[in-house]
Amino acid sequence: STITKVHARQIFDSRGNPTVEVEVTTDKGVFRAGVPSGASTGVHEALELRDGVKSDYLGKGVLKAVGNVNTIINEELVKANLSVVDQKAVDDFLIQLDGTENKEKLGANAILGVSLAVAKAGAAEKGVPFYVHIADLAGSKKPFVLPVPAFNVINGGSHAGNKLAMQEFMIMPTGAKSFSEAMKLGSEVYHTLKKVINEKYGQDATNVGDEGGFAPNIQDNQEGLELLVTAIEKAGYTGKIKVAMDCAASDFYKDGKYDLDFKNPNSDPSTYLTGQDLTDLYNSYAGKYPIVSIEDAFDQDDWENWAHMNASADYQLVGDDLTVTNPKRIATAVEKKACNALLLKVNQIGTLTESIQAALDSQKAGWGVMVSHRSGETEDTSIASIVVGLRTGQIKTGAPCRSERLAKYNELLRIEEELGDAAIYAGEHFRKAHDL
């Protein structure tokens, strides 16, 4: 069937900032999608349209984007009479309607809300679960793969008020036998970590950050890794749970060097690290700790250091700000051999079709693909269906804490239950899940 109405409204994300929610109506019902928003955003991302009216919502209103959906998109999309099952036709139509390279006219936040809501309508039209529809759109093979969750349990960088330069310290239960067991392991380590931090740094160090992780006031990144390993050991899961990091290095890149004390306005330039120094530091961490994945190790345009590190890294090297889920940036990264995995964030590119293409291009290049939330989230669970539909085998959507994070993990538990024996858990093969 076709779309009879497209309606958007302004809602609030998990940080209390306005964001866009879209509802698409067909004769099968009303289908809703909420759009997330990032804090550390790559300069190459599609444009999130904000009103910029300082006196309203501190400039963060999205009434322009909402208005674009309710007028231009609603009128044109209904008139176009496209089938909701044909996701590519709908997304191409939206891209042409916008007409800009980075979706700045209508706003990537407006377009993505429509794209995801249409995809949910398409699944209902076919009478299949959302993840099955996505698998069809991507041409995914069977069996379905349930992802290894990467729980961001210690927060630093732009997400936290501590001195830590690196943004995320994650645990990945690769040794679990199923997704539900991975949830059990992750939550137990999370609670153990809370105790460890409380004993060492006091009660207020266990306040949680934007993604549900803890932000103890530590300065040395290695201390973050120590805390993880201690908690894993105390919980009894050494060997079963690995460690991952998101350094978000673009945030501490200054004049060609890296400042690990970037939150201090008077940091000492003589302590800034070169790309080689930073590479050595990462390799020293990888030698001491069970690190399986490092994301955004260098600045988003520091291709040289990316490629140099990727040439010798035996762990997963994930591009996020580097690649911004953009097929053109991904092609450049493949050509330059800059990394070996993609972080997939639907709102960096703005349509489901382009997101699927980004995943397929990356998988074709032999890369891993990790599906990701943003730090400003909603209760929308689309990425749970996307990670299963695309068989990427890994997802990061925060700590096992805060309902906007658990919404995704809980949806994956439901999908696991529904699939039963028809699905496998990626486990230790998370980097090559698409080959399973």
UniProtKB/Swiss-Prot annotation:
Molecular function per GO: magnesium ion binding; phosphopyruvate hydratase activity
Q: How is the cofactor bound?
A: Mg(2+) is required for catalysis and for stabilizing the dimer.
GO cellular component terms listed in the entry, alphabetical order: phosphopyruvate hydratase complex
In terms of CDD domains, this protein maps to: enolase
Subcellular locations according to the entry: Cytoplasm
Q: Which cofactor does it need?
A: Mg(2+)
Residues binding Mg(2+): 246, 295, 320
Q: Could you tell me which InterPro entries the record lists for this protein? A: Enolase, Enolase-like_C_sf, Enolase-like_N, Enolase_C, Enolase_CS, Enolase_N
| Signal peptide extent | none
Any one of the GO BP annotations: glycolytic process
- In which residues is substrate bound? 159, 168, 295, 320, 372-375, 396
Q: How does it assemble?
A: Homodimer.
Say which family it is in: Belongs to the enolase family.
| Protein name in the entry | Enolase
- Organism annotation: Cunninghamella elegans
